[in-house]
Amino acid sequence: MKKCLMILLIVMMYGCQSKEQLNILVPQGSPAMTILGLDQSIYKVDVVNGPDPLVAAFGSGSHDAIIAPTNLGLKLYQSKDLYQCAAIVVWGNYHLVSSRFESFTIDDLNNQDIIVFGQNQTSDIILKHILAFYNITVTITYVDSVANASALYVNNPNQIVMVAEPSLSQLKALVPETKHIDLQTIYQSLHHDQSFPQAALFVHRDLTEDQIRKLIDNLELSIHDVNDEKDDLLSYGVSLGIVNDKNILKNAISSSHLALILALDAKDELDTYIEIILDLNPALIGGSMPDLSFYWSDES
């Protein structure tokens, strides 16, 4: 009898431990860098390619937390509010590259051809917002992905091409004469040092306040350790396929602008970003500014 009770107790304890492990979904690229320092015994992380798995997860509630483009999370929240925005984790990770110029600056863009990924998406909108402010006229050719944009650049580095990390660092390794313009830096100069909140942490409504707070604290520490370029985390990033070389990953981290800021603390930045999107493509975020229920708060 005692033996049966002991077995039952062990099974119950194991079941409790299993439920404590949170499932996180994250897209490949800079967002995947943020999770490299998380304890894998506490967090089960699924790294995916493309937006389709993210859209499916937001609709089904399959994961405890999702790291996703901010605009995608907002748009899907408008139709099904299973997840709240808890924090911003990736800030502005768009870059223009070219090897044609001695010193590549925003002034070099006027009357040029630019290859841009993601027509009518955030990448396109941020670039157009910056160009409009500087009254710069360009001709844009669109491609459907960063990978395709990068391939075109390798084929002809004299072109001006929009990319994102970690592709930027990979291109610099392949084409050492590459110069780049960090659009985040330009954006900040237009908006009183505000950054644009590119990717965010979204948490399922079923999570407890303690679970969310612990996740935020652990993710913040993970990002801190990633920014410190700890060698074991670089190795883990290579094993996840973010890039295939630790030195390239190290370079990519510094240009990815990784930092965790609670969503409510970043509301001014989010409002500015959302207003820009509403002005150029309202459908990208569901057509309206979110109410306060979109933001997770430990005081709610």
Q: Across the structure, where does each feature detected by a protein language model lie?
A:
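Conserved C-terminal helix/tail region of periplasmic/extracytoplasmic solute-binding proteins
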Residues: 271-300
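Short, glycine-/small- and polar/acidic-enriched structural segments
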Residues: 21-128, 132-134, 141, 159, ...
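Secondary-structure end/capping motifs
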Residues: 206-280
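C-terminal motif of bacterial Sec signal peptides marking the signal peptidase cleavage site
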Residues: 13-15
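Periplasmic-binding protein-like
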Residues: 88-98, 177-205, 252-256, 292-299
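Pocket-lining segment of extracytoplasmic ligand-binding domains
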Residues: 145-236
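Bacterial signal peptide processing site
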Residues: 17-19
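Sec-dependent signal peptide recognition
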Residues: 2-7
